[in-house]
Amino acid sequence: MKKKLYSLLLLAIAMAAPAHAQWNTNGTPKCIFSTTYVDENGETHVGGDYYACSPKAARTADKKTWLAWRTWGRKDVNGISRSAVRTYLQLLDRDGVPQFAEPIMVNDYATTSWWSEYALCVASDGSAIVTVADGRAEEASMADDQDGASTFSPAIYKIDQEGNFLWGLDGVEYPQFTNAAFTNAFVVGDDTFFIFVNSDYTDESAVTYIQRINDDGTTAWDEPRVLINDMFLQYQILPTDDGDLLFFDHTADGARVQRLNRDLEPQWSEPVIYDDHYYGGYEMNHYRIVPDGMGGACVAFQRFMGEFSHNIRVQHINADGSLAFGLTGLDAYNAEEYDHNYPAIAANPETQEILVQFASQLAGKGAVMAQRFTYDGDYLFDDTGVEVAGKNDATSGGYYFGMVKTGVGAVKNGDWLVAYRDITTYSKESFTIRRYNSDFSERVWTRTIARDIAPTDVTMICEDEALYLFYRETKTGKNPGITIFRIGIDGNYDVTYDDGPTVGIENVERSTLNVQPATFNLQGQRISKPAFGLNIVRQADGTTTKQLR
């Protein structure tokens, strides 16, 4: 296939995107990629799901951000217009400024449906790892009257911070698998693990495969290995602090976990059943799992408690497989009232405490709740936790869960960050972010941001210096598109990183002797080659000059 780097549709939208977006300086988030565009007649339109959907974000060790999203448009295949789902990638520097003048188009194959899952993570060298599933195996053989490919073949890409496709323009691909719509990836050291599920709907079967890929794009195994041979098994994998993998799944006996090395060899004599229940719900990622900083993991999940009733179960699994919360875990809401959903979890290795956030709907009241545990399984709040925020349905427009959790994070000194969405009426929401002291006896600060919005696909990331939100704004009049937000852990919007102030083009450090010259436009965005007019060129020694082409 002749790969086109950017589509005309994307260019039309990109022209309307912010020219020099950066992190917000107040409580108003920034649109990094707008779905507002101008057509050939000069009329302005707002694109919906087709123009930008399913955003994902991942942070690098040098405080940059990779953003990915998908679009659904058309492409020409042998003179015939076909449907195509594309994945795009953008890198933000630590100031939040896009580093590519236009987003990089990762894949461009005819695909009828976007009913698939892709993934984004960061390699040890700061490159982006992106997985996709598309119609590459079928595109060349489609019938003339076929709108798009009806198959999904998996592929994985590695793209460095210069925009280079390190594993080739088509990545590491497996076109022999044609029903692998769901893909995922994670990184352990210099190894990347690629996971995809290949389904056979004729006999309702599915096999989950895994491949380990070396830093240079070669594979550790001749063929992908079978990870799971069960269509309905729910699983997740967490890399440990010491380079192993914790593999979470379940059986009829309950939720279980096994420790694996990088060759997928079990490190415990048998899997550990850590709860006699397992997940009950409809989310893609069933369990909320975070490392405990000691080689183990903390997990929270939603489980059935009867018809239309749920509770949140919590467990701490030590590095040796022993269970700190007993054989059956602990309930976040330890009382016989069961309508609790959507957990989030954070762990603080410094204080050895766990915070679980969840949404509750009891007696007509929607609330965001929190429960706190020690690593040893002691409740630090009352049995039913503490209410972070709540409202009656009558005051929330009658919408279920007027208060919806977003996430939690740990601050090194023992404080906690809590974020939630306040739904006033349909398509009218806001985010509230709070910092509490360690025992929730004091609100250190509260910020309500992004009022009157309609966000979807929200990702929250907490780091030592700041909390980040990434989402897709869908509301017309609110600059719809891929949106970013940052706030420091001190409640201020001016964030200083531990390793010094932000470095811009005008003050680049002179410690890059083996770096090739790089070209930027006047907005500070990196471009692959000089544009006609004035450009900024950064030399190998770090000096910057303006050059006219």
Show where each model-derived region lies:
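Positively charged n-region of N-terminal signal peptides that target proteins for export
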Residues: 1-5, 549
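Extracellular, repeat-based ectodomains that mediate carbohydrate processing or recognition
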Residues: 22-500
